[in-house]
């Protein structure tokens, strides 16, 4: 969501397998000329010549095919983590990006925060000496507090289930 807020960004398309996704509509209302698609392949084929950068925030199992499809069209790509489910696919993306001179980034925002940069600097400079043991904790509840299994429900009519499943 932050990317489309930047003053130098002109959003030309949004894609979601669920055509009733509320966030999409708020973005479309702010970017009047942007088009909405349910299939990223259709979006890339239709808008390919109008796109410089693609941001991929699809279900994890579709990151590799969506990223590769965008790069094959010569697009710079920002992909949410995990980049791929297989190391070979990650290497293939890296090699392809290097060969085509494409800028790519995988979203791991927390590692770029000030405390991590501060710590990394002090480790590299030898300021804190040899590290023998590390204790880690998180103030966030990363666990799930709900029911152990989701209740059965019908697929919403607005969601293209096959597109969402992708390569799963």
Predicted regions and their residues:
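A contiguous active-site-proximal alpha/beta segment in oxidoreductase catalytic domains
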Residues: 76-78, 84-159, 163-166
């Amino acid at each position: 969501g932050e990317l489309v807020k930047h003053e130098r960004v002109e959003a030309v398309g949004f894609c979601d397998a669920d055509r009733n996704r509320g966030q999409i509509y708020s973005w479309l209302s702010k970017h009047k000329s942007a088009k909405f698609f349910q299939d990223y392949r259709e979006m890339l084929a239709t808008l390919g010549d109008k796109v410089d950068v693609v941001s991929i925030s699809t279900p994890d199992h579709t990151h590799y095919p969506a990223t590769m499809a965008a790069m094959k069209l010569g697009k710079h790509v920002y992909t949410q983590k995990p980049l791929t489910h297989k190391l070979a696919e990650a290497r293939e993306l890296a090699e392809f990006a290097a060969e085509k001179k494409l800028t790519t980034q995988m979203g791991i925002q927390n590692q770029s925060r000030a405390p991590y940069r501060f710590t990394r600097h002090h480790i590299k400079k030898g300021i804190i000496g040899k590290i023998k043991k590390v204790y880690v904790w998180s103030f966030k509840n990363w666990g799930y507090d709900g029911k152990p299994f989701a209740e059965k429900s019908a697929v919403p009519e607005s969601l293209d289930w096959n597109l969402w499943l992708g390569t799963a």
